[in-house]
Swiss-Prot record:
One of its GO terms (biological process) is chromosome condensation. PANTHER family: DNA-BINDING PROTEIN HU, DNA-BINDING PROTEIN HU-BETA. InterPro entries: Hist_DNA-bd, Histone-like_DNA-bd_CS, IHF-like_DNA-bd_dom_sf. This is DNA-binding protein HRm.
Length: 90
């Protein structure tokens, strides 16, 4: 499912216009992104948790040349599925 399909499904289930559903989906994504950017976590009971993890610097290899390259440390988004979501897909 892509974003347009998600918007259409939200519009159908919530009885919204596609424009309103698109605004709602965008607002949810922007809110999650903003909270993670500010170092916060989002905990949605029964669905899952969004958080930020720190990936330390490491050494890697260029697969074409075999040359060693430095991979800098960075923050990466992380999602952990909750029990309700895990149960729903099994």
């Amino acid at each position: 499912m892509n974003k347009n399909e998600l918007v259409a499904a939200v519009a159908d289930k919530a009885g919204l216009s596609k424009a309103d559903a698109s605004s709602a989906v965008d607002a949810v994504f922007e809110t999650i992104q903003g909270e993670l950017k500010n170092g916060g976590d989002i905990r949605l009971v029964g669905f899952g948790n969004f958080s930020v993890s720190r990936r330390e610097a490491s050494k890697g290899r260029n697969p074409s040349t075999g040359a060693e390259v430095d991979i800098p440390a960075r923050n990466v988004p992380k999602f952990t599925a909750g029990k309700g979501l895990k149960d729903a897909v099994n």
